[in-house]
């Protein structure tokens, strides 16, 4: 039973992480459109989220990024 609960938790974390990832990709692409040719943001964000290792840390980074954009 414990294994099935873990799988369900992992599924919901993956769904949340996917939504967060897609929002981050859209935000980065929107800001990078006219400043320069953007690098492959999918690969860069994937590496960043993989290295962060935790959804909460990725969310913190994204919130700081959004805050910086709102101040500009």
From Swiss-Prot:
Superkingdom as given in the UniProt entry: Bacteria
Protein name per the record: Uncharacterized protein RC0053
């Amino acid at each position: 039973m414990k294994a099935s609960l873990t799988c369900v938790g992992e599924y919901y974390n993956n769904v949340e992480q996917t939504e967060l990832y897609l929002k981050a990709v859209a935000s980065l692409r929107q800001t990078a459109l006219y400043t320069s040719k953007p690098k492959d943001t999918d690969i860069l964000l994937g590496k960043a989220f993989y290295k962060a290792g935790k959804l909460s840390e990725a969310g913190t980074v994204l919130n700081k990024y959004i805050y910086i954009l709102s101040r500009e």
